[in-house]
């Protein structure tokens, strides 16, 4: 253990190859798929709406693989940006960069490799999708640095996590209609809300270390702010359903999602770390409920 109470692993050069690969797997959060799922669901919402059913299989493959690649790259650059902070935060002090098991240079190479593979996949799609991928890279790479300068990194995360939505419409339809931007807005609201649950877990550590978040900004009004965010998300998804002329299955999916969100408020009402983290994880089911509603609704036309 170091003087800061951080478990120190052997230097990267002393690790065996299986150990080193294990640390890289942890670096890209291969052991924690929740982030990929939270990125996958809105991407699939967009693909199914844009195609009015099952999207072209190659397009579906590119976006599904791209979700994992870009989310993994985002985790790497986030840990690189937070390597000064993570050793002092209970939840993050065992991350590979925080312990020294992976060096900063290695992390940057992993980030570049993941983004290059993702970009190579995008190059197989139309030119508009390729062009839209450029701001997507900027959003993913710049997000981790915002927590030093603004209390709204969760909003920016929503912009980054949802960028696959306009890209999906561009890939399938060759343009991004108003429906795509409405769905993008709904995702920004959703991601801001679920990542605020996540930020509530780290709030005490973030205050101590000078990091910023919506959880700190909202303070004692956090649950009220969360309610407003989820209500605005629901209202935007209602507009999506009306504009896309979706049937009963979609509205049933929205109803199920609303009940799932209500459960999150119930378990996190005392703002304890464990329940707030469970509320964050629970949003996977919210995304799934909305996707099932969309998929069944468009299949039944």
Curated annotation (Swiss-Prot):
Transferase in keyword set: yes
Top-rank lineage group of the source organism: Bacteria
Catalytic activity: all-trans-octaprenyl diphosphate + 4-hydroxybenzoate = 4-hydroxy-3-(all-trans-octaprenyl)benzoate + diphosphate
Annotated metabolic or biological route of this protein: Cofactor biosynthesis; ubiquinone biosynthesis
PROSITE patterns: UBIA (PS00943)
Transmembrane stretches, start-end: 34-54, 57-77, 108-128, 163-183, 221-241, 245-265, 279-299
UniProt-listed GO biological process terms: ubiquinone biosynthetic process
Keyword annotations from UniProtKB, A to Z: Cell inner membrane, Cell membrane, Magnesium, Membrane, Transferase, Transmembrane, Transmembrane helix, Ubiquinone biosynthesis
Record localization: Cell inner membrane
EC number, UniProt record: 2.5.1.39
Cofactors: Mg(2+)
Enzyme category, top tier: transferase
InterPro entries per record: HB_polyprenyltransferase-like, Prenyltransferase, UbiA_prenyltransferase, UbiA_prenylTrfase_CS, UbiA_sf
Membrane topology type: Multi-pass membrane protein
Entry annotated with the keyword Transport: no
Predominant localisation class: membrane
Cited HAMAP family: UbiA (MF_01635)
Biological function: Catalyzes the prenylation of para-hydroxybenzoate (PHB) with an all-trans polyprenyl group. Mediates the second step in the final reaction sequence of ubiquinone-8 (UQ-8) biosynthesis, which is the condensation of the polyisoprenoid side chain with PHB, generating the first membrane-bound Q intermediate 3-octaprenyl-4-hydroxybenzoate.
Family listed: Belongs to the UbiA prenyltransferase family.
Protein name according to UniProt: 4-hydroxybenzoate octaprenyltransferase
Source species: Xanthomonas axonopodis pv. citri (strain 306)
């Amino acid at each position: 253990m170091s003087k800061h109470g951080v478990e120190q692993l052997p230097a990267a050069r002393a690790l065996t190859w299986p150990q080193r690969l294990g640390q890289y797997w942890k670096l890209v959060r291969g052991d924690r798929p929740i982030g990929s799922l939270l990125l996958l669901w809105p991407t699939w919402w967009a693909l199914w709406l844009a195609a009015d059913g099952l999207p072209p299989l190659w397009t579906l493959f590119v976006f599904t693989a791209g979700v994992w690649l870009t989310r993994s790259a985002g985790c790497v650059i986030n840990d690189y940006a937070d390597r000064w902070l993570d050793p002092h935060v209970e939840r993050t002090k065992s991350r590979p960069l925080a312990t020294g098991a992976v060096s900063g240079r290695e992390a940057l190479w992993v980030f570049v490799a993941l983004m290059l593979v993702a970009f190579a996949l995008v190059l197989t799609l139309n030119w508009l999708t390729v062009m839209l991928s450029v701001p997507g890279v900027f959003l993913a790479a710049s997000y981790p640095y915002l927590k030093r300068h603004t209390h709204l990194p969760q909003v920016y995360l929503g912009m980054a996590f949802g960028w696959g939505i306009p890209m999906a419409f561009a890939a399938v339809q060759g343009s991004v209609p108003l429906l795509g931007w409405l769905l993008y807005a709904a995702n920004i609201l959703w991601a801001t809300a679920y990542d605020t649950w996540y930020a509530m877990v780290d709030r005490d550590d973030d205050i101590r270390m000078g990091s910023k978040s919506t959880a700190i900004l909202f303070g004692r009004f956090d649950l009220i702010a969360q309610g407003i965010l989820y209500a605005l998300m629901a209202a935007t998804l209602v507009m999506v359903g009306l504009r896309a002329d979706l049937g009963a299955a979609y509205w049933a999916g929205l109803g199920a999602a609303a009940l799932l969100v209500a459960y999150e408020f119930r378990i996190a009402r005392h703002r304890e770390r464990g329940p707030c983290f469970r509320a964050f994880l629970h949003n996977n089911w919210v995304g799934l409920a909305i996707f099932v509603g969309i998929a069944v609704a468009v299949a039944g036309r």
